[in-house]
Amino acid sequence: FGYLKKNDWFHLGIGSNLTLIDFKKRKEIRELEVGIDFNYDADTSGNSNPITIGQENEFTFFNSSKFQFSWDLKTSGKDTTITRKNVDFPYVKNMGSLSFNIDYESPSYGIWEYDWRIGYEDAEKYKSFNSDGYRRRYAKVGGSFYPTDNYRIGFTARIRSEKEWLNWIENNELAVYDLSQKIISINMNWYRGTKHEIRLKSQFVALQAKNPRSLIVNESGYLTESFKDVDPFSEGITSFQIRYKYEIVPLSYIYLVYTKGGSIFENNIMRETSEIFKDPWNNPDNEIFSIKFRLKY
């Protein structure tokens, strides 16, 4: 149970968890953790966000693998943040939705392991404009490879698509898009004794928002069609860093760091996904090589 009040916003949450460990007929299961949560948010003017009821079930097996499935039910309510605290248009009314997620983490296969996740969310149709209802689909797959104790490389790919993704533009002007987001992450860690360490972190994001439809929200929070032109857009984001650390003496280090990254936003220009990934890498906002020292006296 928890209660939090901050500035013009407060949150009330109630949750319960139960762990089961005695599975005589399914001896491969080590434990099952079952949880349920209730969350309520609102601003101090009495505008209530959607109430959320969530339920989660996680199986842990003796081979160290895990399987989880969960669902969340959201009621209709008011989104009090999307219009950036506009005094005349303080919120947008959202429709209720149901979401479901499944996760799996594999056991270790000696030198490698993997995990995946799939999820969806479907919402009711808006009645104030020609709506097909919000829909979200999500998939993730990842893996790690560790042929030796001192070397590990990990890879993760995420794909997310949304129909009627709602985006604020300015004042009471909004738009819904068909959104596609793809994320690739690669990480690596290598060390030799206590003297040498190389660490790589990287993430590449490609976002596309297509088929925009212009909307406006009235003082009561209802969305209606607008005739204003809205452009599709795309954005690519790159974050890359490789770092070498050398221990001079215990607790004193020298770091050689190479960082490269940036973002490129294109309005009304549709690009291929490969171009969205490559553009911020080929035209970065920053590219820095630095040397740092950390000395203990």
Where are these regions (language model features)?
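Exposed, low-structure sequence patches enriched in small/polar residues
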Residues: F1-Y297
